[in-house]
UniProtKB/Swiss-Prot annotation:
Family under the similarity heading: Belongs to the beta-cyclopiazonate dehydrogenase family.
Cofactor: FAD
UniProt cross-references to InterPro entries, sorted A to Z: FAD/NAD-bd_sf, Zeta_carotene_desat/Oxidored
Name by which UniProt lists this protein: FAD-dependent oxidoreductase pigF
Functional pathway: Secondary metabolite biosynthesis
Subcellular location: Cell membrane
Pfam families associated with the record: NAD_binding_8 (PF13450)
Keywords in alphabetical order: Cell membrane, FAD, Flavoprotein, Glycoprotein, GPI-anchor, Lipoprotein, Membrane, Oxidoreductase, Pigment, Signal
Topology class, membrane: Lipid-anchor; GPI-anchor
Length: 465
């Protein structure tokens, strides 16, 4: 029986409990012991917003972020010559009260998002064939289906059992509702999902929802951006204000999370020292895959859920010296597929930006790749596009100005797990062992995450704090 139990726990990735001696206050100097109401793990859109809200609510916190900046998937390149900001991560934010309030908090005015329009060439990035994509932007039929599930706008699967349509592969869903004409449109709106026809319909709808579709249909005000440009400015301002309570280039080493509401102890490695954070609550604002959560010594209930999450590899960046004609964009389209949707691995598109000659690219893979491997693949497909257009190669190789790694993205679980109540159980972890959760595994948009934090996470976390 003991062997069977060990095998079961191993299969769900249950981590061993941390050495209790790690949490002894006697082993830390006074300046390396931090007492706070809340420890926040992750400084992306979710964690940064939670930190600002806690400060405004009069609660103390420490935020731990593994990189040197806040902002997560929001990347802005500033041209060194002109000072022009170029977005190569998050391009816009849903126009919700949560978004408007967050930007207003830092006195950043917003305007409607108007995407740049450049002539588009549809090319098979593998063969170099020009592809006649019959792009249909009339997504009314799909929108009618999405609107049946309003809770998906915030990642909340409040109905149970889960409707069977949501558990169909998107390919089967398309066939059921005769949506073949708009497959390529949904594909390019949902870049990063991966092989879209093989994904579950619920995954696609969670990414390509009412907000994105409203913008496509010409509804003004569906998305907003800072009036001065630079989507990353809000995170820069947040860092400047909260710097004393943020540990950058740092990571959690171990955590003690008793189930009796007696508070938590978390060991954090910073560039200069190891700190012991004593807190009443934890907000986990990173993906709860085992590689992130094993340091928190998940129990069987938690590990069973965390071990099931899988995501796609996704990379973004800016490149110049491509030899491609400027002020035009190039979309990958499979010449051999009836819906023209290419399979992974692939460069999704190579798009012009506001800087002439600088292109924004997006690359996806089913497995994680090194930065060098991604750049090699993108360079190869740039050459294929150039040959398709019959334009000469430039002197030298493409120059990569910026690179962002969004791996893993669009994390999800199999249909069987969802049907068995996976998301019900995942939401059921809110508050368990003094730990609360927010972030992209619930909803893949900043505005949706901020709503989740404001409406669900903070009210529960603040009770009794």
């Amino acid at each position: 029986m003991m062997l069977l139990t060990l095998l079961i726990l191993s299969s769900v990735g249950l981590a061993a409990a941390a050495d209790p001696s790690l949490f002894s206050e006697n082993d830390y100097s006074p300046d390396n012991i931090v007492n706070r109401d809340v420890l926040i793990v992750g400084g992306g859109a979710a964690g940064t917003h939670a930190a600002v809200r806690l400060k405004d609510l009069g609660k103390s916190f420490t935020l731990v972020e593994k990189s040197s900046v806040l902002g997560g998937h929001t990347h802005t390149y500033i041209d060194p010559t002109t000072g022009t900001p170029v977005e190569f991560g998050v391009h816009s934010f849903g126009n919700t009260s949560d978004t408007r309030d967050f930007f207003a908090r830092f006195e950043i005015p917003l305007v409607d998002f108007v995407p740049a329009r450049f002539p588009v060439h549809y090319i098979d990035f593998n063969t170099g064939d020009a592809v006649a994509v019959a792009l249909d932007t009339n997504v009314t039929g799909y929108l009618d289906q999405v609107e049946k599930y309003p809770s998906l706008a915030y990642g909340w699967l409040t109905s149970f059992p889960v409707p069977s349509d949501l558990l169909l592969s998107f390919g089967d869903f398309v066939n059921k509702y005769s949506l073949q004409k708009i497959v390529y449109t949904i594909y390019y709106l949902g870049v990063g999902i991966g092989n879209i026809l093989q994904q579950l319909t619920i995954t696609v709808m969670n990414s390509v929802g009412v907000g994105i579709l409203s913008g496509l249909q010409g509804v003004p005000g569906g998305a907003v951006v800072p009036a001065a440009g630079n989507n990353h400015a809000i995170f820069d301002k947040a860092l400047a204000e909260l710097r004393a309570d943020i540990l950058l280039n740092s990571h959690v080493v171990a955590a003690s999370r008793p189930a009796n509401n007696s508070g938590v102890k978390v060991v954090v490695q910073t560039p200069n020292s190891r700190k012991l954070v004593l807190a009443k609550r934890i907000i986990v604002a990173v993906l709860t895959q085992p590689e992130n959560m094993n340091v928190f010594s998940p129990d069987e209930r938690e590990a069973r859920l965390f071990s099931q999450l899988k995501g796609q590899a996704f990379y973004v960046g800016l490149v110049t010296n491509t030899g491609l004609p400027v002020n035009q964009s190039y979309y990958n389209a499979a010449s051999s597929e009836p819906d023209n949707v290419p399979l992974l691995p692939k460069t999704y598109n190579i798009q012009s930006t506001v800087l002439p000659g600088v292109f924004w690219w997006l690359y996806g893979s089913e497995t994680a790749l090194t930065e060098a491997a991604v750049k090699t693949a993108v360079t190869s497909q740039i050459a294929t596009v150039r040959r398709a257009l019959n334009v000469p190669a430039p002197a030298g190789s493409p120059q990569f100005l910026a690179f962002g790694n969004h791996t893993p993205t669009h994390v999800t679980v199999p249909a069987e797990a969802i049907a068995s109540g996976f998301y019900r159980d995942l939401y059921g972890l809110q508050g368990y062992r003094n730990t609360w959760y927010t972030g992209a595994q619930f909803i893949d948009s900043a505005s949706g995450i901020w709503n989740l934090t404001n409406a669900v996470v903070l009210p529960g976390l603040l009770t009794g704090l």
